[in-house]
Amino acid sequence: MRPLSILAFAGYFKGGRFLERCKAEGCTVYAFMPEELKTEAWPFHAIDEVIATPSYYTHRHVLNTLSYLGRTRPFDRIVALDDFDVEMAAHAREHFRLTNLGLGESNARYFRDKLAMREKAKSIGVRVPEFVGTFHNEAIRDFLDRVPGPWLVKPRSEASAAGIRKCHSSHEVWRRLDDLGDDRAFALIEELVPGDLFHVDSLVCNGKVIFAEVNAYHQPLLDVYQGGGVYATRTFPRNRPEVAAIKVENAKILEGFGLGQGASHTEFMKAHRDGQYYFIETSARVGGADTATMVEHATGVNLWSEWAKLEICRTEGKYELPPLKQRYAGVVVSLAKQENPDTSSFDDPEIVHRMDMKYHIGFVVAADTPERVQELLSKYMERIARDFNAVLPGADKVSH
């Protein structure tokens, strides 16, 4: 019997642990990526073949390439390692008729298109900020008259806070829509809901959430992305009532959206105005910015590795979570003024990971108590802001 073959869409340099786990489980691993990424430090020992193309984002070219290669290489699973790969991977699954082994194009929209996300969440009884599509002028005018500002004009398919504009008047909203031109229809407008932003990092098996870790951002990502500053997130104390409430909403989203099997990073806002939880966005992938490293040191679960196991056992075999730890961890990350910042003065024993990326500084810390994690993050954020932090204007698109 031939080994199971995994085709991984890799539009960004990430997911090495996923590929290594697939290989360790005996799979044949194909990594499909843009030409410019083939020289990155991939775990080539775990990749049977790198398929690199200069036309990675052209759907017909991708299908032609994979169809030709598929004459001699069977593809049993098609996986998207990054947010921007989700739609193309779904398109390929539809083409190869593997929609029973991952998201098809309709369900993939719920994990990429913020307008589709909100409509679906609302239909299954999950609270969302007030929103409107940008297709019809009269609907927009009605929305702006009915819903108090400020408002956010958001790209429907960008990741994180890229491209979001905060508008304080209806005039600003219309000006932003005019600036978008033909891209206007690929945006939405929603009310700004001030609050505390949480993210849930999950694993799903057979349509049910089997692992969910609730984490809290230091401040909303929009504030960090557009105002500069230092990014931080941490394990939220597991005995707090917010954790149970957010897990309930998270399960509604992932099970209602039809993820089926895999990993997810989902965000909720606890609103200052009413204490209720509002769904912000979800995804069908592992969170970025060292989130997976943080979760692993807090729980013992490596999201990339466990996601690989879940993909492998879709049609046969049983999946079991590894033993869980009950520790706490946090991440702090910032752009740096220095190309290679000297972090030797950060010497606390709780540091379990140091970011190695030009013009960036970052750490993952882990401890037995949430108080110690918060103490370290607060100290590091202050030092980084003072001695290292660099601020660039917020971009309209995420740059890989």
Region spans (language model):
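ATP-dependent carboxylate/phosphate-activation module, predominantly the ATP-grasp catalytic core
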Residues: 171, 191-259, 263, 270, ...
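Glycine-rich phosphate-binding loop signature in dinucleotide/nucleotide-binding domains
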Residues: 68-75, 145-147, 181-183
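Short beta-strand-to-turn element immediately C-terminal to the catalytic PLP-Schiff-base lysine
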Residues: 134, 164-169, 203-205, 365-366
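Conserved ATP-binding module of the ATP-grasp superfamily
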Residues: 127-129, 150-153, 162-199, 226-232, ...
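Short acidic active-site motifs
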Residues: 61, 139-143, 172
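ATP-binding N-terminal substructure of ATP-dependent carboxylate-amine bond-forming enzymes
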Residues: 1-105, 138, 369-370, 378-398
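A conserved helix-loop-beta module that forms one wall/lid of the active-site cleft
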Residues: 94-163
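Peripheral (often C-terminal) accessory segments that flank ATP-dependent C-N-forming ligase machineries
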Residues: 5, 15, 140, 306-400
